[in-house]
Amino acid sequence: MRILLIEDDMLIGDGIKTGLSKMGFSVDWFTQGRQGKEALYSAPYDAVILDLTLPGMDGRDILREWREKGQREPVLILTARDALAERVEGLRLGADDYLCKPFALIEVAARLEALMRRTNGQASNELRHGNVMLDPGKRIATLAGEPLTLKPKEFALLELLMRNAGRVLSRKLIEEKLYTWDEEVTSNAVEVHVHHLRRKLGSDFIRTVHGIGYTLGEK
């Protein structure tokens, strides 16, 4: 899951980016309001964590512009503004959730996962395809009921494919979902991850659509 984080507090921002990265999220972090606002237009983010008090452009103005321009990415407001009127205003501007500082990182992750479930119309955290089960919240994967050991990028790729079952995902889109701007990506990185997953899940689990990308095979 690729997350856009817009937070000007260096300590908080670093803690969120580091903590979520360890949980398997890919996080792009911006400290300036305008830069963060523009970032949403240039990459396929799954969710946004937005502070309200930002240099350059207030978080409420950013959110208002996104919604007016049709951006529908789920937004979690994370701010010290805890007054009822502030929370109501943020939600009415188009935020999907609101969390006041101080916070526990595990709750931030849980709220992001809940936003993704609602976005994808899921009732449960678990993703299933054939005899493969994935629980992104618990970072658990099983094959025919047996524990499956996956590296972080393998887990992220499998989650992406399972969340988009029935769709063909291009290599470019997969790269954009799996890697942040400050990560180096080799030309065959996606192919390598697909190869490793096929070795663990079976050669037919991921299907190559030549000239287009990858999709899950038949159940």
Curated annotation (Swiss-Prot):
Q: State any single GO MF term.
A: transcription cis-regulatory region binding
Domain (Response regulatory): give its ranges. Answer: 2-116
Q: How is it modified after translation?
A: Phosphorylated by QseC.
InterPro entries according to UniProt: CheY-like_superfamily, OmpR/PhoB-type_DNA-bd, Sig_transdc_resp-reg_receiver, WalR-like, WH-like_DNA-bd_sf
Biological process terms from the Gene Ontology for this record are: DNA-templated transcription; regulation of DNA-templated transcription; response to metal ion
**Per its UniProt entry, which superkingdom is the organism in?**
Bacteria
Q: Which SMART domains match?
A: REC, Trans_reg_C
- Residues modified to 4-aspartylphosphate: D51
Q: Transcription regulation: is it a keyword of this entry?
A: yes
Tell me if Ribosomal protein is a UniProt keyword of this record: no
Q: Which UniProt keywords apply?
A: Activator, Cytoplasm, DNA-binding, Phosphoprotein, Transcription, Transcription regulation, Two-component regulatory system
Q: What induces or represses this gene?
A: By the signal autoinducer AI-2, through MqsR.
GO cellular component assignments: cytosol; protein-DNA complex
Family annotation (PANTHER family): REGULATOR OF RPOS, TRANSCRIPTIONAL REGULATORY PROTEIN QSEB
- Please give the function described in this protein's UniProt entry: Member of a two-component regulatory system QseB/QseC. Activates the flagella regulon by activating transcription of FlhDC. Currently it is not known whether this effect is direct or not.
In Swiss-Prot or TrEMBL terms, this protein is called Transcriptional regulatory protein QseB
